[in-house]
């Protein structure tokens, strides 16, 4: 690669998004585990295996411990960082949570095997990312801050670039 150029890094999302989008996040941990080592050997930048609806689905529909799932995946992925999708101030839920709850959840996520938090706010309100970014940095995790793309008169390239720069200033390791 030419000097000064950055490589494109690929995150595999099949362990979270594929079954979240296709079958309402109903894959059990036992269905997921057999493929983890194969995915780990491919050379991805990260495996997004947790977050989004996985936590809720484990508890409500699969009768599984989501923390145990995370630890089992991490145990099998020896080479590839584990990534999660984190809804900013909403954590993995459907409402805002207090800062101390966000901080504690981030701390426990990293302690149980998450290396990279892909943090987003569906409305692109960076204030809803601030606490999670600070907590992730405090725990030495990788902050992948997210800009949600859509089209409208308000959503311009300039606004997306401005937001990306704000996220960089807030401590994002990647966008």
Go through each PLM region and give its residues:
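Alpha/beta enzyme core
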Residues: 5-10, 24-54, 59-81, 90-175
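Acidic, glycine/proline-rich low-complexity segments that act as flexible tails and inter-domain linkers
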Residues: 16-20, 25
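Charged, compositionally biased N-terminal leader segments and the immediate start
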Residues: 1-2
């Amino acid at each position: 690669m030419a000097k000064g150029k950055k490589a494109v890094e690929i995150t595999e999302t099949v362990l979270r998004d594929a079954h979240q989008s296709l079958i309402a996040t109903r894959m059990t941990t036992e269905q997921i585990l057999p493929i983890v080592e194969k995915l780990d050997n491919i050379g991805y930048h990260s495996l997004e295996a947790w977050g989004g609806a996985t936590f809720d689905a484990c508890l409500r529909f699969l009768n599984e411990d989501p923390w145990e799932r995370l630890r089992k995946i991490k145990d099998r992925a020896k080479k590839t960082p584990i990534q999660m999708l984190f809804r900013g101030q909403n954590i993995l839920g459907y409402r805002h949570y207090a800062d101390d709850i966000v901080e504690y959840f981030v701390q426990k996520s990293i302690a149980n095997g998450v290396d990279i938090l892909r943090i987003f706010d569906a409305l692109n309100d960076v204030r809803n990312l601030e606490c999670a970014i600070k907590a992730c940095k405090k725990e030495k995790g990788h902050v992948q801050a997210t800009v949600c793309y859509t089209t409208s008169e308000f959503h311009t390239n300039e606004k997306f670039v401005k937001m990306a720069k704000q996220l960089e200033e807030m401590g994002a390791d990647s966008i």
